[in-house]
Amino acid sequence: MQKSTANPVTKTRPGPTATTNKTGNFGMLPPGATLPTEAQCAARVQLSSWEPRSDNYTANHRIPTAQQIAGMEAWNDSTGYDPRADALRKQIAGNYMGTTDEILQWTACKWGIDPNIVRAEAVTESYWHQSQLGDLTTDQSVCPPGTWNGTNCYQSYGILQIKYIYNKGEWPMSRDDTAFSAEYMYGVIRACYEGWTSYLVGRPPSPGYPSYHAGDIWGCVGRWFSGSWYDQGAIDYIKTVKAHYANEDWLKAGF
């Protein structure tokens, strides 16, 4: 395990607090904005001893190796991105350790996203469990290495459900490292929000919805689920995330 340069564990955490429903001193940054550094975001995280997902502890304190990060695939024309997006991809290292909520806050800060959107989407995808498995298949050709059990495997892993077939260079960090998993997924969202997910250009949305453009965070949230722009799958997914966002379900009793 590498030592994190932005590890909040050494800081004194206050007890559980309702401030986890607030955006703190960071939130949505428009396309083209200068994004905060990892260190700046570590300093902005609202620390708390609150940890509703103690099962995440090992993954929350694991950081990818330099070799693993070097194996990530570039974001360019061949992968459906404007080449400018690769500058975002190169910032992804999963270099943070903390509680599950602290990791989600840090991720939101780093990519200039409302933290409650990140929290709500993590509820939708995994109920905040980094161990979440999804998309069971009997097609061995789409299984991550080492996951085929002779009958089937799961394709999607982690707190925000990264699907192996579309993100091969991010395996096994997408399964094993919470900060990497969250940071990578929202790096994808940020590239979309900047207008740099080039394969979406020209894809027709459902009637009444706008075409792909920079600055539409909810369209980009839907794109994560369906791979398209305001198709019916994306629209339904957005509604689910928005409901968790409005209800702040991570603060409900029993979460």
Regions found by a protein language model. Give the residues of each.
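Short, functionally critical alpha-helical segments immediately adjacent to catalytic or ligand/cofactor-binding
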Residues: 102-105, 110-145, 162-163, 185, ...
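Non-catalytic cell-wall polysaccharide-engagement segments
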Residues: 2-82, 91-95, 148-155, 160-255
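Asp/Glu-centered strand-loop micro-motifs enriched in Gly/Pro and often flanked by an aromatic residue
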Residues: 87-96, 104-108
